[in-house]
């Protein structure tokens, strides 16, 4: 029997129904399994009822359904007595469908029905579409058919508390939302429209196991490095998830130093969410919407890797979970102190062979003077700028090799209690013993944030 009395979440029987009571404070309503990808071949109905004399107000905070012309495929339908039903599908920026954006739905009576349909498919799991997250609330019904939200005592305009689905998301700005005369929910302190739920970074569900041999590589367990990306452009490379839509990587994986085609990259393929290459390929490529390479990167200068950093914006947000979580950005120089230990993970060459499993190594931040002396002894001409740092020990095995480029070096931030990507695998002198040289992410944090937060006239590669 799939008739359930719930207070906010649809469960996952193939066809199901729920009756929800709208109250003074907003409650969450999500698609089955949100924020994990929803399963094909199911249908859910939620009838939301308000007390006598009140209406139902519904606002979507997140919406990500598979797009289709006219929303004939997967869809959410909003219906209320006396009005035409509204069918929604797609996601932000979709060229197909009709996503709700920040639309507000208010019932004409005291009830509203939401129907979620995911059509049957040979592939039971959709293409990593996570469904929806909505807030519903009772609102005072007015004679003219309008509605006003319950007023928090002493609050003018009306206010509600913002909530996000943990543990993978948190409120961008904790506190209260208000509904002024514009009838759009805004952050009371900053005056912005409904704040987004932002991903929690740097906190894997599965702790990283200590490597008893200290040096050398170990096989990663699922969830150890949930930010790890596998890229395929001019060959295999790596990267790290930032937020739920961006990949941090090295510029030279996109525009290689030895390429005869300057500033012309091939198709960029990004795979996420597993520690096995074969399984990653089965999960499918995440299409890239935009490639942004740092302006200081000089592809034609073979001995200068300054500015070796790039960002890949994915077409769609990815559903976060134990195997797919973002890493954090650094915010202070103490994370680069000599002797501080960190981890590097990747799918690079090991003992001359390409690996199909994610490996990781524990390596220390090296003294800058030691790395400079090491380069001089070998008469190397590569630029070692202040935007770089080095990792490893001169006489110990350095397991980083071809195929690891773009992957990140992470250290534990004792103050913030999270893993931070301080470096990006950039260049080295062969594989084996010695030091590896990394892009210093701290030097580029302002640039990274500027690109990610850009809304107009954004830079392209």
From Swiss-Prot:
Function: Mediates the proteolytic cleavage of HP/haptoglobin in the endoplasmic reticulum.
GO BP of this protein: complement activation, classical pathway; innate immune response; zymogen activation
Annotated keywords: Complement pathway, Disulfide bond, Glycoprotein, Hydrolase, Immunity, Innate immunity, Protease, Secreted, Serine protease, Signal, Sushi
Disulfide-bond pairs as recorded: 71-89, 164-197, 371-390, 401-431
Descriptive protein name: Complement C1r subcomponent-like protein
Listed InterPro entries: CUB_dom, Peptidase_S1_PA, Peptidase_S1_PA_chymotrypsin, Peptidase_S1A, Sperma_CUB_dom_sf, Trypsin_dom, TRYPSIN_SER
Species assigned in the record: Rattus norvegicus
Keyword Manganese attached: no
Classification lineage: Eukaryota, Metazoa, Chordata, Craniata, Vertebrata
């Amino acid at each position: 029997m799939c008739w359930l009395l719930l207070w906010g979440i649809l469960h996952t029987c193939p066809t199901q129904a729920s009756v929800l009571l709208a109250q003074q404070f907003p409650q969450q309503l999500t698609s089955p399994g949100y924020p994990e990808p929803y399963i094909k071949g199911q249908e859910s109905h939620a009838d939301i009822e308000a007390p006598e004399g009140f209406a139902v107000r519904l606002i979507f905070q997140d919406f990500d359904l598979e797009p289709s012309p006219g929303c004939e495929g997967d869809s959410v339908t909003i219906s209320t007595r006396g009005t035409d039903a509204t069918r929604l599908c797609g996601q932000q920026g979709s060229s197909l469908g009709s996503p709700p954006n920040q639309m507000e739905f208010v019932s004409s009576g005291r009830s509203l029905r939401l129907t979620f349909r995911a059509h049957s498919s040979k592939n039971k799991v959709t293409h990593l579409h996570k469904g929806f997250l909505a807030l519903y609330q009772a609102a005072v019904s007015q004679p003219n058919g309008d509605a006003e939200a319950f007023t928090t005592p002493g609050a003018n305009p009306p206010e509600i508390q913002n909530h996000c689905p943990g543990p993978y998301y948190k409120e961008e700005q904790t506190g209260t939302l208000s509904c002024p005369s514009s009838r759009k929910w805004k952050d009371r302190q900053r005056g912005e429209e409904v704040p987004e739920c932002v991903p929690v970074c740097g906190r894997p569900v599965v702790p990283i196991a200590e490597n008893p041999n200290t040096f050398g590589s170990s096989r990663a367990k699922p969830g150890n490095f949930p930010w790890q990306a596998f890229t395929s452009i001019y060959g295999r490379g790596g990267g790290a998830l930032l937020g739920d839509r961006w990949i941090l990587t090295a510029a030279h994986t996109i525009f290689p130093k030895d390429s005869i085609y300057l500033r012309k990259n091939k198709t960029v393929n990004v795979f996420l969410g597993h520690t096995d290459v074969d399984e990653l390929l089965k999960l499918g490529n995440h299409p890239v919407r935009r490639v942004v390479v740092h302006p200081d990167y000089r592809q034609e200068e073979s001995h200068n890797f300054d500015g070796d950093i790039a960002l890949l914006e994915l077409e769609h947000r990815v559903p976060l979970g134990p195997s797919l979580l973002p890493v954090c950005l650094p915010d202070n120089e103490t994370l680069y102190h000599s002797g501080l230990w960190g981890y590097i993970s990747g799918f690079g060459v090991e003992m001359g062979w390409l690996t199909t499993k994610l490996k990781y190594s524990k390596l220390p931040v090296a003294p800058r003077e030691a790395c400079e002396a090491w380069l001089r002894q070998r008469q190397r001409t590569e630029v070692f700028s202040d935007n770089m740092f080095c990792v490893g020990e001169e006489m110990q095995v350095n397991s980083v090799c071809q195929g690891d480029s773009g992957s990140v070096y992470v250290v534990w931030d004792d103050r913030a209690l999270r893993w931070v990507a301080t470096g990006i695998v950039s260049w080295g002198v062969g594989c084996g013993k010695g030091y590896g040289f990394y892009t210093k992410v701290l030097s580029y944090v302002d640039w990274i944030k500027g690109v990610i937060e850009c809304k107009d006239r954004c830079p392209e590669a």
